Each structure stands twice: as C-alpha cells, then as structure tokens.
Amino acid sequence: MAEQGSIRVSRKDDNVVVIEKDLATEEMLLSMGPQHPSTHGVLKLECMTDGEVVTSAEPYLGYLHRCFEKHCEVVDYPGIVPYTDRMDYLAGMNNEWAYCIAVEKLLDIEIPRRVEFIRVMVSELNRIASHLVAIGTYGIDLGAFTPFLFCFRDREHILNLLEWASGARMLYNYIWIGGVAFDIPADFNKRVKEFVDYFRPKVVELYKLLTENEIFVKRTKGIGIMPADVAINYAWSGPMLRGSGVQWDLRRNDPYSVYPELDFNIPVPDGKFSDIGDCLSRHLVRALEMEESLNIIEQCISKMPGSDGFNPRSAVPKRVRPKAGEVYARAENPRGELGFYIQSDGKSTKPLRCKARSSCFVNLSAMKDLSKGQLIPDLVAIIGSIDIVLGEVDR
C-alpha cells in the first residue's frame, strides 16, 4: 500500500495561514453569493481555495446597479437629493449633505449658521445609527446575537428623532440645496440631549458585549490585516483607514461646515488590544466613534443659534442653474469619504455630469489583498469589517 502524504497548517506572526504539504493538491473555485447572509447584500465573491485556505477572492458587483449617475443627467439639481438617500440607505442624511455641499459650492451660496448646526447634528445622529447597524450585524456574522438586539433597540431612538425632524425614518429628503426642508421642532434639542444622556452608558455596554467576548476577539484579532501604506495606496478612507492607524478624517483634515468650531477626537487603534489594521481594529474605531459623535451633538445643541426669525429655506434658490464649471466636494460619511463631481454647462437646470465617489466601492476593492492566506471562515469576518452597503457600491 502506497504511503499517504500529509498536510500541516500553521499561522505566521501576521496571522497568514501557511500550508506545508508533501502531496499534490490543486486549487478549487468557491463562489460566495450573490445570495449569502455574510455578504450584506447581493455581492458575489469568487474565491480560489487550497483546502480551507483562500489564495484569492475576487468581488463581482453590479447586481444592484440602478443607473444613479445617468439619472442625475435627466433630473434637475434639487430632484437628485432623494436619489442620494438610496445609495447608502443607512446614512441618508450624510449622502444628502455631501451632494448639497457640491452644488452649493458650484452656486457659491452662503448657508445660514443655524442650518449648519442642524445639518451637523442630524448627520452625526445618522452616523451613530449607521455604526449601530454595522456593530450589530457584525456580531451576528460571527455568532453573537445579543448585541444585534441591543444595537437595534438604541437605533430605534435615533430613527424616531430623525422621523420627528424630517417625517421619514430612512429616506429623509431633509437636507436641501441651501438649507433644510423644515426647522427642527421646538423641543427637538431637548429630546436629543435626553438621548445623548441615555446612550452614553449604552456605548460602554455595547463595547464590552463584543470586546469582552473571547470568541469574537479570536475571530477578528489578527485577521485581514491591512498595513497603513497599502491602505493609503488603495485610497481607503473612514473607519477602514483609521483602523490601519492613519488619523485621517475629513471633518478634521479638510473641515467643512462648522466642524472647525467643534472639539472632538479621531479614534485610531493603539495596538494594545488589537493588531493595527485587523478586523478588530476596524470594529473598535466604529465603537469609539459613536462616543465622539455624542460629543459633537452636545456641542451643536449648546452653540446652535436661536430660531427667532429663522427661515430654513432662506438660502434655497428658487431655480438652480449654476454657471458653467465643475466642482468636486467630499464629506466624511460613516463608511468613509463620499465625494461628488458635478459638471454644469451653464444653461441647463440639470447636471451635465454627476459622478459619485463611493467609499464602499473603494474599500471593497482591497478584498483580494485582505483575504489572501486567510481561512474560508475568516472571509465572513473580513467582509463584515468592511461594512459595505451594496446600494452605494453599485449605485
């Protein structure tokens, strides 16, 4: 009887799986998705595997493509705002704001100070709501169900506040070119302050639920490491880039609106609890950012001008027809930099060209590097740490 070969699997210091074998094997093609619970939408991954080890993972996109940029060429400037809600549908306020910043830059109009504080406040509320979804669903991906329930319990408070201000729970159409649709209700700031006081201890609770879970830590620590220089070369942004130790945040490094007047920190991992650039680091950044958003919201409440004689649409143009030119504007969204390039011919009330720069698309492009040398179950942890929304990836 012929002697059987053997395979030995081990991990290097950087947690990449190493296979030592003295028998012939061949790679196998494994498809994940486009209908798979771990891909957070209609994402397909074509993985080449050597046993349980992934040698390559190629994302296939387009299953949710809706021609957003082409629609922008046949819709007038204000009419595009509701379409932006449907890109990253978990952060509609942030999408609207990024688009409006670009058009306002093209029009060269000044925004009322109260409007600026309202925009910051509702966008930071939306940032927290988005991170709660990211943290809750990440727990489910790795087998922890309870944090999901806690996250959605607290997210409900935020959705109620945003519904009170805008009339909608997810697709808001609240931030308009030059202003906002409505002034916030009389007791809105009071209710927001009550939420801030309620949620501060909950942030600590949610943090401990996962970071003190030994299984969660072992599934994420040292997995999917992305060095800072490679992350920069991929043009990563948001929690993904900060998770690699790069302290880059547009609210601080390229500030817009009233962010220069606000005091807040940019959380980055210190390497004591996680390996810088791994899945756990990216999770920690999102958890810590919620605390900073609460600080920003409190400052907005205290610094916001009064509503006497205030018209939320005072700077909203009756007809938007920018002069001929082009502009690029960007904003710090929950998943990274969302940018809009807009080109105007100076004659039409519709953009000649509107290009959206999606952070989710850029972050997902590194999937091949993130997955190489990892085990198949680790792919679930890596995808969840990217926190993609396919509505923004495909547009």
From Swiss-Prot:
What is the membrane topology listed in the Swiss-Prot or TrEMBL record?
Answer: Peripheral membrane protein
What InterPro entries does the database record attribute to this sequence?
Answer: NADH_Q_OxRdtase_suD (IPR001135), NDH1_su_D/H (IPR022885), NiFe-Hase_large (IPR029014)
Which GO molecular-function terms appear in the entry? NAD binding; NADH:ubiquinone reductase (non-electrogenic) activity; quinone binding
Subcellular location(s) of the protein: Cell inner membrane
- What does the record give as EC number? 7.1.1.-
Key words, A-Z: Cell inner membrane, Cell membrane, Membrane, NAD, Quinone, Translocase, Transport
**Claim: Transport is one of the keywords in the record:** yes
- Tell me which Pfam families the record gives: Complex1_49kDa
Quick one: where is this thing mainly located? Answer: membrane
**Reaction it catalyzes:** a quinone + NADH + 5 H(+)(in) = a quinol + NAD(+) + 4 H(+)(out)
Q: Name one GO cellular component term.
A: plasma membrane
Q: Which family does it belong to?
A: Belongs to the complex I 49 kDa subunit family.
Subunit description:
NDH-1 is composed of 14 different subunits. Subunits NuoB, C, D, E, F, and G constitute the peripheral sector of the complex.
Give the function comment from the record: NDH-1 shuttles electrons from NADH, via FMN and iron-sulfur (Fe-S) centers, to quinones in the respiratory chain. The immediate electron acceptor for the enzyme in this species is believed to be a menaquinone. Couples the redox reaction to proton translocation (for every two electrons transferred, four hydrogen ions are translocated across the cytoplasmic membrane), and thus conserves the redox energy in a proton gradient.
Q: Tell me what this protein is called.
A: NADH-quinone oxidoreductase subunit D
